[in-house]
Amino acid sequence: MRKLFTIDLKDYNPNDYERPSITSDVLLFSVSDGVQTNYRKLKKKYFSVLLVKRDRYPFKDKWCIPGGFIGMEETCEETAKRVLATETNLHNIFMEQLYTFDDINRDPRTRVISVVNMALVDKNKLDDTLYPKASWFNVT
């Protein structure tokens, strides 16, 4: 069989192209019951998102979704798992890739593309294991 294409990598220089930074972020949601005040009514449900307080600039001390830069030897999924473990102390969470955010000037440091994963968890089973800089916020 004849080859249609040949690749000659000696002429390829990766430094000829600008490269963006890529992050993997995780949107963790939970639905939980409120306090039942009337036995004749169903408990109120609360929809929450997990945020972490940033400890670095830019946006130091602001709340954000957990995320981090993808290492050269990591996949997006591996990075998401690492980020959840290091920033929230959560492990073995099933995630699905949700969306890729690629606005050009969304990060003041450099060009950043973010691959966002999503998960739905039972926060009542996780609250005791969370790190102090991670907190649930009700979505209204």
Regions found by a protein language model. Give the residues of each.
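Short histidine-centered catalytic/ligand-binding loop motif
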Residues: 64-73
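Active-site donor-binding loop signature of nucleotide-sugar glycosyltransferases
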Residues: 54, 67, 139
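Nudix hydrolase/Nudix homology domain
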Residues: 1-4, 12, 60-63, 126-140
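Glycine-/small-residue-rich active-site loops that bind phosphorylated ligands and cofactors
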Residues: 57, 71-72, 105
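N-terminal strand-loop-strand
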Residues: 6-7, 11-64, 92
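Generic detector of short, locally flexible boundary/turn motifs and exposed helical patches
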Residues: 2-8, 62, 80-85, 101
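Active-site segment of metal-dependent pyrophosphate-handling enzymes
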Residues: 44, 77-81, 85-140
